[in-house]
Amino acid sequence: MSSPVRTPPPERLEPNPGMSYAVMEIAIIAAVITAVALVLVCLLFLMLRYLYRHKGTYYTNEAKGTEFAESADAALQSDPALQDAGDTSKKEYFI
């Protein structure tokens, strides 16, 4: 009598469960690093654009003729925009 032929069990087609978690973690880490790098590049672009567009735009609002005055008080007393209709003997200085 011949012995029955045994067939080997079918191979599992499922991937190794430990390996799938490792691949998934690598994909998540790569996505986060890519997102952070993209945000940093965008911020760098916006900062360089801002610095380029606002280069040398510094405007002062000083009274005209202040460079020829003896002191700051003398320059401000002659400025018509700062002339007060009230009494000039009372002066208040805010520091």
From Swiss-Prot:
UniProt-listed InterPro entries: Glycophorin-C, Neurexin-like
Sites of Phosphoserine modification: S71, S78, S89
Family (UniProt): Belongs to the glycophorin-C family.
GO CC list: cortical cytoskeleton; membrane; plasma membrane
Positions in the Cytoplasmic compartment: 47-95
Main location: membrane
Protein name: Glycophorin-C
Keywords, sorted A to Z: Cell membrane, Membrane, Phosphoprotein, Transmembrane, Transmembrane helix
Compartment(s) of residence: Cell membrane
Transmembrane segments: 26-46
Membrane topology: Single-pass type III membrane protein
Residue spans, topological domain Extracellular: 1-25
Superkingdom, natural source: Eukaryota
Organism per entry: Rattus norvegicus
